[in-house]
């Protein structure tokens, strides 16, 4: 009977220890997430609010050395990138269809062999110092092969990337 009590205490001790670990781990995750929100420099927040004063439910993350604001506006997902000096780097608008891109881009894509693939995503990327780029992402049917096609607004294909292994993440370094 005594051994049973010790066993129960032993089990409770380790259960509490595991619970304590999970509790501490979840609190650390919460603190680190809120710490990032506190770390967002005021000048970056101000630069963003100047560009998008009507944006709500903005989520921030750090990527490729930049601060990225993610939000939805007019039923479109928008990512706005700023460098550490609060300078606007680029904006990515997820427009999701060819109907929302310049006609020469849609025509050039439809005339290409890539149009036979499944259309996965369409994004318009704007920059302060570079021309606009339209990125069309396609996927080979019944395959894991994915490609990104980079067009100028006049319909000229600038670049084609196989992103099968990389994923389709767009970041400023792709355009340097």
Which stretches of residues belong to each language-model region?
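Interaction-mediating elements
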Residues: 38-176
């Amino acid at each position: 009977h005594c051994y049973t009590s010790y066993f129960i205490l032993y089990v409770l001790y380790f259960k509490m220890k595991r619970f304590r670990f999970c509790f501490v781990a979840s609190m650390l995750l919460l603190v680190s997430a809120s710490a990032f929100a506190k770390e967002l420099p005021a000048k970056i927040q101000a630069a963003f609010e100047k560009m998008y004063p009507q944006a709500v439910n903005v989520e921030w993350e750090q990527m490729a050395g930049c601060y990225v604001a993610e939000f939805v506006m007019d039923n479109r997902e928008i990512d706005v990138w700023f460098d550490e000096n609060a300078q606007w780097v680029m904006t990515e608008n997820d427009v999701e269809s060819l109907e929302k891109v310049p006609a020469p881009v849609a025509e050039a894509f439809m005339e290409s062999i890539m149009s036979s693939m499944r259309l996965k995503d369409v994004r318009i990327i704007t920059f302060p110092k570079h021309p606009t780029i339209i990125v069309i992402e396609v996927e080979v049917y019944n395959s894991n092969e994915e490609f990104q096609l980079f067009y100028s607004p006049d319909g000229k294909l600038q670049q084609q990337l196989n992103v099968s292994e990389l994923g389709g993440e767009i970041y400023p370094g792709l355009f340097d």
